[in-house]
UniProtKB/Swiss-Prot annotation:
The modification Phosphoserine is found at residue 29. GO terms for cellular component: cytoplasm; cytoplasmic side of rough endoplasmic reticulum membrane; cytosolic large ribosomal subunit; cytosolic ribosome; large ribosomal subunit; synapse. It is found in: Cytoplasm. Belongs to the universal ribosomal protein uL29 family. The keyword Phosphoprotein applies. The gene is Rpl35. Component of the large ribosomal subunit. Keywords: Acetylation, Cytoplasm, Isopeptide bond, Phosphoprotein, Ribonucleoprotein, Ribosomal protein, Ubl conjugation. This is Large ribosomal subunit protein uL29.
Length: 123
């Protein structure tokens, strides 16, 4: 099999990708048998290409799966941990913008009764 390009894989359905993955794995096992039995050098160099192709197919499968999960959980209140933004621990525990703006009744009353004084400077 020739080297597979990831952009060609992205248009395919999951069933097609899984079938291609199985084909590549079978081919890899055949190449490994050829290696043990003393096969041609061309077959030995092909092992690397097939391994990388398997990795490409798996990468595309995983990326599309994660993309679909992101679409599913978009707008929902709770998301799985691996779909949440990766921040530092401190940033995750920080108050939200809304929580920071909240004021107690006492604080609201004080601000209403004693507004900030504005002074005019005589020039």
């Amino acid at each position: 099999m020739a080297k597979i390009k990831a952009r060609d894989l992205r248009g395919k359905k999951k069933e097609e990708l899984l079938k291609q993955l199985d084909d590549l794995k079978v081919e890899l096992s055949q190449l490994r048998v050829a290696k043990v039995t003393g096969g041609a050098a061309s077959k030995l160099s092909k092992i690397r290409v097939v391994r990388k192709s398997i990795a490409r197919v798996l990468t595309v499968i995983n990326q599309t799966q994660k993309e679909n999960l992101r679409k599913f959980y978009k707008g929902k209140k709770y998301k799985p941990l691996d779909l949440r933004p990766k921040k530092t621990r401190a940033m995750r525990r920080r108050l939200t913008k809304h929580e920071e703006k909240l004021k107690t009744k006492k604080q609201q009353r004080k601000e209403r009764l004693y507004p900030l004084r504005k002074y005019a400077v005589k020039a």
